[in-house]
Amino acid sequence: MDENQPSLKDDILKGIDAIAEFIGEDFWRTQRLCTKKAIPAAKMQGRWIASKRKLRAHYDRLTAGQTT
């Protein structure tokens, strides 16, 4: 395993609550984003999971070139 990458258990968020907290959204909005595949998440055995690394890359792409 690459020393710069976190272990899988440290990278994976399990459940809408954990994903919502990580991206700074509420439960219902996060569930909608997952269901509509607006963020990189998948359902595994009935539970939503997402990679912190992939979520961060997704939001980096969305905000690339934007200034405040």
Show the residue positions of the predicted features.
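Polyanion-binding surface elements
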Residues: 2-33
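Glycine-centered, phosphate/nucleic-acid-interacting loop/turn motifs that mediate DNA/RNA or nucleotide
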Residues: 37
